[in-house]
From Swiss-Prot:
Primary localization class, coarse: nucleus
Designated name of the protein: GATA transcription factor 18
Record PROSITE patterns: CCT, GATA_ZN_FINGER_1, GATA_ZN_FINGER_2, TIFY
Record key words, sorted: Activator, DNA-binding, Metal-binding, Nucleus, Transcription, Transcription regulation, Zinc, Zinc-finger
Location within or outside the cell: Nucleus
Compositional bias per record (Low complexity), positions renumbered to this chain: 1-15
Pfam families xrefs: CCT (PF06203), GATA (PF00320), tify (PF06200)
Domain of life: Eukaryota
Lineage of source species: Eukaryota, Viridiplantae, Streptophyta, Embryophyta, Tracheophyta
Native species: Oryza sativa subsp. indica
One of the record's GO cellular component terms: nucleus
Length: 319
């Protein structure tokens, strides 16, 4: 019996649960809908806040962009004034030339020419290369000015191969050339000189050889001695032997054979010099044996008996 009562109670509870399930489900759905609605409203509010934040941040981005730097040399319009100061570019609209003139006079500047506006326009073509410099605001004004001066100087450069100075041109024209190139003295020595120069050089060489072809002491030819040396009469006046003795002892050596040979040569020359009529006008030069100095051995050999005879003669007289 108790078991049957318990089973009946369990069945009633199950029925009650089955009846209450749809109501709970409906109630749960309503709660979920309410939560979803709350979440949706929160998301909408966040989106509205984001849009408002974007709207607040957009105005600075929507501000008109800063005017591009324009050079004072390249005005956009006749009444537009552009100033460049410390890398900053300032553009002023509707500025008449009269106002600019008044400001310049107030600052103590000179009077602006009346045709300045007309003169600036042609410079636009010439100053196109300065746009990249003048449009940059990160470069100081001094740097911009120095770059402009550099570019102005670069325009004057001339890379053509030509002589620029008149002095250098004159020097180049005076210099000797060999196959179109400048030739120095060393290169010109191998080349033949002009006929006049050759004759002059030959004449001077012959005179030089005739003057200094023989030793003044012994008459030795220049070709018969290793080198001509300095003597009392100057350089290249003595042969090698005479010059060495003169340099070492300060005296000239005796050359009897050379004197005899020189006298014979002089005799032959005098015999050869005959007048056209066949009569010799020069006297015959005969070497005098007394003038020929004896050699050192002969002097030593002959002097001893002579001295003994001289010494013995007074002794004989005294006896």
């Amino acid at each position: 019996m108790p078991d049957a009562a318990a089973a009946a109670a369990a069945a009633q509870d199950a029925d009650a649960v089955m009846r209450d399930a749809p109501a709970d489900a409906a109630a749960g759905g309503g709660d979920n809908n309410d939560d979803d609605g709350d979440d949706g409203t929160e998301e909408d509010e966040e989106e509205d806040d984001d849009e408002e934040g974007d709207e607040e941040e957009l105005p600075p981005a929507e501000d008109p962009a800063a005017p591009e730097p324009v050079s004072a040399l390249l005005p956009g319009s006749p009444n537009q004034l552009t100033l460049l100061f410390q890398g900053e570019v300032y553009v002023f609209e509707s500025v008449t030339p009269e106002k600019v003139q008044a400001v310049l006079l107030l600052l103590g500047s000179c009077e602006m020419p009346p045709g300045l506006a007309n003169m600036v326009l042609p410079n636009q073509r010439e100053n196109r290369g300065y746009d990249d410099l003048l449009q940059r605001t990160d470069i100081p004004a001094k740097r911009v000015a120095s770059l402009i001066r550099f570019r102005e100087k670069r325009k004057e450069r001339n890379f053509d191969k030509k002589i620029r100075y008149a002095v250098r041109k004159e020097v180049a024209l005076r210099m000797q050339r060999r196959k179109g190139q400048f030739a120095g003295r060393a290169n010109m020595e191998g080349e033949s000189l002009s006929p006049g120069c050759e004759l002059a050089s030959q004449g001077s060489g012959q005179d030089f050889l005739s003057r200094e072809s023989k030793c003044q002491n012994c008459g030795t030819s220049e070709k018969m001695t290793p080198a001509m040396r300095r003597g009392p009469a100057g350089p290249r006046t003595l042969c090698n032997a005479c010059g060495l003795m003169w340099a070492n002892k300060g005296t000239l050596r005796n050359c009897p054979k050379a004197k005899v040979e020189s006298s014979v040569v002089a005799t032959e020359q005098s015999n050869a010099a005959v007048s056209p009529s066949g009569i010799d006008n020069k006297e015959l030069v005969v070497p005098n044996p007394e003038n020929i100095t004896a050699s050192h051995g002969e002097v030593m050999g002959d002097s001893t008996p002579a001295n003994e005879a001289e010494i013995g003669a007074p002794k004989a007289q005294s006896q």
